[in-house]
Amino acid sequence: MLSGLALQDNGIPIYVQLREQIAAAVGRGVLAPGARLPTMREVAVALSIDLNTVQRAYAELERDGILTMVRGRGSFVAETPPQRPRRADTREFAARIAAQAQAAGIALDELAEALKKLAGRT
């Protein structure tokens, strides 16, 4: 699982990148329901990041119903992943896209216009 993680210095917090990459791996079926994830310490050491960063990513994944953490046993992909994104997830996703756009030098009004065109509303 660790070999597929690629963290970048792109203005997006590391815990967000880690959380999103794990969630995407679950969504694509790379991490199957019930699969055990590496320990937080293993992830922190392998990626040369702070343990608190990994803890925050795992905690948010658990909050979102993607992971289940069992004290003394480890972290596992939830047997029944969440079905629909919540409104808070949509806002968070939009905030991440906005941060990426700004880091790339794209004005937010340009981004909004491009999204409207993609949605078929000009």
Where are these regions (language model features)?
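N-terminal helix-turn-helix
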Residues: 36-67
